[in-house]
Amino acid sequence: MPARHPEALVAGSEYATVVVENLSRAQIVQYAGVSGDCSPQHVDEVYATRVGGYPTVFAHGMLTMGAAGRLVTDLVGDGRIVTFGMRFLRQVWPGDTLTARARAEEPETDRGRQVVRLTLAVVNQHGEQVASGYTTALVDGLVG
C-alpha cells in the first residue's frame, strides 16, 4: 500500500493490506530474540506440543500487533500515533498470512489537536480474526 497522508483518510472508509505473508518459524524465533521474550511456547516445539498441548509453536501477540502497526503507519505516517491497543483473540501459527484492516472514524479534537481513531482487525488466511484493536493518530483533517 502506498504511504498516505493522514488528511487523506476518509471517515467511514476501510483500508486493508497483507502485513505478514507465510509467517516462518525463523521469523518467530527472530522476534523472540529481538523482544527478549523467549517463552518456550514460541520457540520450543517439544514444550509447545507436549507441555502446552498446542499443535506447534505460535507467534507472540506483540508480533501480530507490530504487524498491524505497519498498516497504521502506512495510513498516518511515522510519529503520529497517540494510542495503540490490541486484544489477541487466537494464536498465529507458522505458515499464517495476516491481513490488517482499519476503519477510520470521524476526527475529534483532543487537547487542542485533531485526532482520528482507527478501529483495527487482523485476520488470517482462513478469514479468522486473530486480533482486534484501535489506534488514535494526529491528523490535520479528513477529506470526506
Protein language model features and the residues they cover:
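Residue-level structural signal for beta-strand termini and adjacent loop
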Residues: V20, G69, T135-T136
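Short, intrinsically disordered, mixed-charge
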Residues: G33-G36, T73-D78, Q125
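HotDog/MaoC-like acyl-thioester-processing domains
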Residues: M1-Y15, W93-G144
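Hydrophobic beta-strand-centered segment that forms part of the acyl-chain substrate-binding groove
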Residues: T49-E105
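Catalytic strand-loop segment that frames the active site of acyl-thioester-processing enzymes
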Residues: M1-V57
